[in-house]
């Protein structure tokens, strides 16, 4: 079982608890994802600010890890809503980009 497969199972179970009425739709999910991407970008800005010695608030790589995890969770929730197999989609897109730009590296999910 891949990490993504395990995440999907956990997302399915948690959504039954979180959204008992089933009202969360794709528009909500899209806004949720955008918010999490924005939070990740804000942490990156703070990390870069510190790297360049610019005054202002700081962040940690641990905070970035948390925000990126939220992005992945939200992306999976959207994929779940539309019945998308993210393992297959990621491999397909990664490999298509490699082919398009003439690179040899290909991605194959571990359990395929």
Q: What do the predicted segments below correspond to?
A:
Residues 1-112:
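Flexible "arm" and connector segments at domain edges
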